[in-house]
Design a protein with these regions (language model features):
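Helix-adjacent hinge/juxtasegments
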Residues: 59-98
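Short, contiguous alpha-helical
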Residues: 9-66, 105-153
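Basic/polar N-terminal segments that are highly enriched at the extreme N-terminus
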Residues: 1-5
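Short acidic-hydrophobic surface loop/beta-edge motif
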Residues: 100-102
Length: 153
């Protein structure tokens, strides 16, 4: 079980590294890619929504698909990183199986373990970063390598 906690912590270090790489690329791009910005904003909002749920608070008022400026993305990336780093530093192995009850944006109640939620957050961002890379390729731009193994090298 200790290995599981270390793996989740490593996944979140990768998540932050990958977010920073995407953000830097979007900031340095000559042409604004509105779709890529929208997807990146969504990744960051979703991370915040899930953190709020993990804290036992209502997330229904939080945006999920609201596009924000790249300047705001910098702040959100840093805040999300701080929030999750603090949470992960305090989690014990037994905490991972604790069940969290929350409502989705439609008001439906769900119950998932902290382990399941943290795994979802890490994988959700990777999915959308892949979509961002697809948009970059379509615009004849170089995709950003955010593979986990690159992070570990």
């Amino acid at each position: 079980m200790v290995i599981l906690l270390e793996t989740i912590q490593s996944m979140f270090k990768h998540l932050h590294w990958a977010n920073q790489r995407i953000l830097e690329n979007l900031q340095n791009s000559a042409a604004e890619n509105k779709q890529a910005n929208n997807l990146f904003s969504h990744i960051l909002h979703a991370e915040n929504v899930w953190f709020t749920r993990l804290m036992g608070s209502d997330s229904s008022h939080l945006p999920i698909w609201e596009e924000v400026s790249l300047e705001s993305c910098v702040e959100i990336v840093n805040q999300n990183h701080h929030n999750y780093a603090e949470l992960l530093s305090k989690l014990s192995i037994t905490d991972l199986d604790q069940v969290v009850s929350y409502q989705n944006s439609k008001g439906t109640v769900f119950h998932n373990s902290i382990r399941e939620i943290l795994t979802h957050v890490a994988l959700h961002g990777q999915y959308h970063r892949g979509q961002i890379n697809q948009l970059l390729r379509k615009a004849d731009l170089e995709p950003i390598n955010v593979d986990f193994i690159i992070f570990k090298r």
